[in-house]
Regions:
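Metal-coordinating catalytic core of metallo-dependent amide/deamination hydrolases
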Residues: 127-228, 233
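Hydrophobic faces of well-ordered beta-strands that scaffold small-molecule active sites
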Residues: 56-58, 111, 146, 214-216, ...
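Glycine-enriched alpha-helix->loop->beta-strand junction motifs that scaffold or abut catalytic
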Residues: 230-237, 253-260
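N-terminal metal-binding scaffold of metallo-dependent hydrolase/deaminase domains
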Residues: 1-40, 47-51
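Active-site-adjacent beta->alpha loops and helix N-cap segments on the catalytic face
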Residues: 244-252
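Generic beta-strand/beta-sheet core signal
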Residues: 12, 61, 114, 217-219, ...
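Conserved small/polar residues in nucleotide/adenosyl-binding loops
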Residues: 265-269
Length: 269
């Protein structure tokens, strides 16, 4: 056990900070209060120091780029196919990248690492600690979400390759087509009908069953389309970056979706 004594504690459950103690066991907070004691605990005196909860950065590309960079599009998205749900971004994450050191030194203790936004269906994300050297040991949970993208990023990527989609409506069509086909595949399985195994549709099943959320890169140009499309399948979803969301407040509230703005970690060494 670890006992942190005499810090100015800023707990999430209290209205005001107080001078007190935090007792940890097996890497988790066991008790917060004043005058705590534990005979077998390592004790550290934090008199004059502040003790705050770690910051969670829920949308990050940290460690997906080279040489300490957060990421570049070519590193954090596989662009061979605009529909790439089977891509798992944990295989691209490098915890020796300088971003992780910068994060922990500045109080960011947990990251939601997502694929980039060059595809329409980009892949799955994971949650990780920011300290360690083996990303699989650092990982808190795999497959926390499916990353989707609308707008200029997939449009521009595949337009430059003379591939579909090369328009905003083409991007939305591919998104709709994917979930329609994945739902038909899932429904057949649920009815006990024989289906040929399809990994791309298998990845969509926990999304369609609301077990994990879809997280859609989207700005004001495509926000109404994103809400309409994902609400049609009753998905849990968040709009990522969400520039111009003030234009769609009523639609956002009615859909029950979440909003995530910018990542906390966008630095290069």
């Amino acid at each position: 056990m670890l006992l942190l004594k005499n810090a100015t504690v800023y707990p999430q459950t209290e209205k005001a900070p107080f001078v007190g103690d935090v007792l940890c066991e097996n890497g988790r907070i066991k008790e917060i209060g004043k005058d705590l004691s534990a005979d077998d605990a390592e004790t550290i005196d934090l008199t004059g120091l502040n003790l705050l909860p770690g910051i969670v950065d829920c949308h990050s590309h940290a460690g997906l780029g080279p040489n300490g960079d957060v990421a570049t599009l070519s590193y954090c998205t596989d662009t061979a196919n605009p529909v790439s749900p089977e891509m798992d971004v944990i295989y691209a994450a490098d915890p020796t990248n300088g971003c992780y050191r910068w994060a922990i030194e500045n109080g960011v203790t947990t990251l939601g690492i997502l694929p980039g936004s060059c595809d329409v269906i980009d892949g799955t994300g994971f949650a990780t600690r920011t300290w360690g050297s083996n990303i699989f040991e650092m990982c808190l949970k795999r497959n926390i979400c499916m990353k989707l993208s609308l707008g200029e990023n997939p449009k521009g990527m595949f337009q430059n390759k003379n591939m579909e989609p090369d328009s905003r409506m083409g991007v939305t069509f591919i998104l709709e087509e994917y979930f329609a086909n994945a739902k038909a595949y899932m429904d057949k399985k649920d009815r006990g009908e024989k289906v040929d195994y399809n990994e791309q549709y298998e990845v969509a099943i926990p999304v369609l069953k609301r077990e994990i959320p879809a997280r859609i890169h989207c700005t004001h140009n495509d926000m109404a389309a994103a809400i309409q499309c994902l609400s049609k399948y009753n998905l849990r979803f968040t709009i990522e970056h969400a520039w111009g969301s003030s234009n769609y407040l009523d639609e956002i509230v009615a859909s029950g979706c979440g909003i995530v703005y910018l990542s906390l970690i966008h630095i290069s060494e």
